[in-house]
Amino acid sequence: MRNTILFGVSMILLANFCFGIMSAFVKITADYFSPMENVFYRSITMTLLLLLIYPFKPYRLKSYKQGGFKKLAFRVVVGGLAMLAFFYNIEKISLATATAFSQCAPIYTVLLSPFLLKEKLKRSALISACIGLVGVVLISDPSVENVGPVEIFMGILSGIFVSLAYITLRDLREYYDKQAVILAFAFGMSLLGLVGMFIDIPFLSTGIHIPRKEDILWISLIGISGTLGQYFLTYAYMNAPAGIIAPIEYTRIVWGLLFGLYLGDTFLDLKSSLGVALILCSGLLIALPALLKELKKI
């Protein structure tokens, strides 16, 4: 049991590192590619890698039972919108702040679950979510770096859409193999990104820019790191309880800060640092009951 949990913890740490470095590569390419193009290149590379792996490690592609396609399509759309909003913010604001906005998903999950899942909202969870919302307000300061109304809106959207994707994943386990969900997400986002590149969308899609020689490396690294991150994330939740894994996911903000500083981001000021700290505390408090419950079983 302990070895399995240790393996799961190792996997989530690796996943967060991979997602962190993927975000750094996206920031590097953001000077040339639009957020929509980065979504497409990230997704199509991931799709090709998954198709190459499939013959060596096949899995069930068909659903276990009927009724899951709409849920899968919804997961693709909200997951794609979350990625698009996140990639936009990576281009415009510091990597740490963009990541912090995205990592607010558990806060929104707590607030949305009573309406979408008919779950009872506990007072402790509500207080924790409110602490996180204060953190969101603190990092949503227009006087800090380039955080304007559009960036704040995109940041909040990225967190909400990630939370909706997580909520949907709970149901999808009854219909599809985990690997099939990953492949469907990658393929669906490739299609959405491809179509989106031909549509002029302010801030998000500014036409098609043909990849230069030096861009091929970055595009490949974005796809590889994103694919590895998704695989490590899947294996983490397969081998260890979610109550133990979820709090560790917040190390992604640390990687966002470190990689951002390396790429030239300025260090967060006191107000933004406090906001990120409150978001971290909020997420940990939300996950604490499940974490303690799982630790007692060890």
State the predicted function of each range.
Residues 34-48, 88-105, 148-161, 212-226, ...:
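Structural signature of hydrophobic alpha-helical transmembrane segments
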Residues 105-127, 254-273:
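C-terminal transmembrane-helix exit sites in multi-pass transporters
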Residues 4-7, 40, 64-68, 141-160, ...:
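Juxtamembrane helix-entry segments on the extracytoplasmic side of multipass membrane proteins
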Residues 16-24, 51, 76-84, 106-111, ...:
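Hydrophobic/small/kink-forming positions within alpha-helical transmembrane segments
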Residues 124-141, 271-290:
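Hydrophobic transmembrane alpha-helices of multi-pass small-molecule transport proteins
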